A protein has these predicted regions:
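Oxyanion-binding/catalytic loops of NTP- or PPi-dependent enzymes
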Residues: 1-76, 97, 115-515
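Amphipathic alpha-helical coiled-coil/leucine-zipper-like oligomerization segments
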Residues: 99-111
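Short, conserved non-catalytic motifs in the polymerase core
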Residues: 84-96, 271-272
Length: 515
């Protein structure tokens, strides 16, 4: 068995996988649930946490203690308050509050319990996951007692799985991975030749997925209920319950043309029918966004749709018929089907975990994963804020300067220089920016770190500061700002929180029993 396992930590569902004795990726299931994917929903009690579908049983009695869609909060400085039943700013948080990393650690601990051998893992994240979200994922794993060997982008993991299949020769060439899950969307174009996966570019939206479709269905239900009864549903009290109800309807409409269900509300129970056509119309705005991002990915690659050999579907939301129809309209041919879209990402993470632990694999496992190789890219523009003279405005302005270009192969290292603008300048700003566009306006970039490099002496303007960025294969940045004249450095390594900070977070949850 593989000593390193693969984990798909999802918005709606999560999964854990490893290579079996023959080298095939095997998605593991819990002993108490008859399914291989685990709902990323948790119930938090005083001394007990329930992870998975059983957490939903607490919705009626204690809805404020049920947490879902945690993945969407990973980059935010928030905590979930069981007193308020919502995410609140970190500085507002009091007792009975949990960070996104803590909540995710509960899910990881549950998955870890599916096998006794988990100590190290490859964990998947969305391609467009921001720096803070990646670091929070590493924090969550550490609290769950898992050493992360590498973070891998979800569509890349799926491509890695496809590359390992015995019939891989049938899907070689330019492959588009269309990954639409419960909370996030990624579309990645890559070359797959002789089991080598070479990512070209990715686009996506970390706030676009099946959960957004559920909300549109809920809005439909509410409107129909009001039309029939004159009253709206009470969404302030039972929104999560209604959303679970909406998800059930969405699943049904993926295979049926209409679905009728009795809806409980303030005016009593009422039978509501929703057709597939109504559903598709309600999510049209989201479909247009998916189409736009798909076209952006193709355009950004420098290729045309007709040059792409295959489109692979990943993520449970790709089962919705209009998704395949939209892809076919853009690509000129239908996407490939036949692989379990819920398990492909976890399976790919297991294959990559096998690549990372080849020395511990048996002969059959080594033969099964064959010559699979992986080369990913930086999905953001990584830069720094610099001050310069603007001859038009006749004043100094601050703007963003790109250091590492988007789609640069990983691991990446780039060095550039910036210069002081004043005589006797005592310090320079050391900032790190991240953006999806090549923006110079600082208002349109995400500032992920800010500090100062103080100079040991005074010099005329034009003092050179060497800026070096290193971006690792997990998508985590390391930066150095060096004053060339004195060799004084300001170094930044955006890694998980300090051991002391993590210890404090862990101490608040270590007594909790996870079921």
């Amino acid at each position: 068995m593989s000593k390193i396992i693969g984990i798909d930590l999802g918005t709606t569902y999560s999964a854990i996988a490893q290579l079996d004795d023959l080298g095939n990726p095997e998605v593991l299931s819990s002993t108490d649930e008859n399914r291989k994917i685990t709902a990323s929903t948790i119930y938090v009690g005083v001394e007990k946490v329930i992870v998975g579908d059983k957490a939903l049983d607490a919705l009626a009695a204690t809805p404020k203690n049920v947490i879902s869609e945690t993945k969407r909060q990973m980059e935010n400085d928030v905590k979930y308050s069981t007193e308020k039943g919502e995410w609140v700013e970190k500085d507002e948080a009091e007792e009975n509050c949990y960070t996104p990393a803590q909540v995710s650690s509960f899910i990881l601990s549950k998955l870890k319990g599916y096998t006794s051998e988990v100590q190290k893992a490859v964990i998947t994240v969305p391609a467009l996951f921001a720096e803070k979200a990646r670091i929070a994922t590493l924090d969550a794993a550490k609290m769950a007692g898992i050493e992360v060997i590498e973070l891998i982008n979800e569509p890349t993991a799926a491509a890695c799985y496809y590359a390992s299949l015995p019939n891989v020769e049938k899907i070689t060439g330019k492959i588009l991975v269309f990954d639409l899950g419960g909370g996030t969307f990624d579309v990645t174009l890559c070359n797959v030749i002789d089991q080598k996966v070479d990512v070209i570019t990715s686009r996506g939206d970390k706030w676009l997925g099946g959960k957004d479709f559920d909300k549109e269905i809920l809005d439909l239900i509410d409107k129909k209920y009001k039309k029939e009864t004159g009253k709206n549903l009470d969404l302030s009290q039972g929104k999560l319950q209604y959303l679970e109800f909406a998800e059930k309807i969405k699943r049904s409409l993926s295979v049926k043309s209409k679905h009728a269900e009795v809806v409980e509300g303030p005016a009593g129970p009422k039978k509501i029918e929703i057709t597939r056509s109504e559903f598709e119309q309600s999510i049209q705005m989201h479909i247009e966004k998916l189409k736009m991002l798909l076209e952006e990915c193709i355009d950004g690659s420098g290729h045309e749709a007709k040059e792409i050999n295959h489109t692979l579907l990943v993520g449970g939301s790709t089962r919705i018929p209009i998704i395949s129809k939209t892809i076919e309209k853009v690509m000129g041919k239908p996407p490939l089907k036949g692989v379990n879209v819920d398990e492909a990402v976890a399976a790919g993470a297991a294959v990559y975990a096998g690549l990372k632990s080849k020395t511990s694999l048996n002969t059959a496992q080594k033969k099964a994963i064959g010559k699979v190789q992986l080369k990913d890219v930086c999905n953001f523009y990584m830069g720094t804020l610099v001050q310069r003279d603007d001859p038009v405005l006749n004043r100094k302005i601050i703007e963003n300067m790109v250091v590492i270009e988007r789609d640069t192969k990983l691991p990446a290292e780039e060095t550039t220089s910036v210069y002081t603008l004043y005589d006797d300048q005592h310090a320079i700003d050391c900032s790190i920016t991240q953006s999806e566009g090549r923006e110079s306006n600082r208002e349109f970039v995400n500032l992920i770190h800010q500090g100062d490099l103080e100079f040991p002496d005074k010099k005329p303007k034009g003092r050179e500061i060497q800026v070096t960025y290193k971006y690792d294969t997990s998508g985590v940045i390391h930066c150095t700002f060096k004053d060339v004249s004195s060799n004084k450095k300001y170094e930044i390594s955006l890694r998980p929180e300090s051991a002391e900070d993590l210890k404090k977070q862990y101490e608040t949850i270590e007594h909790i029993v996870i079921e």
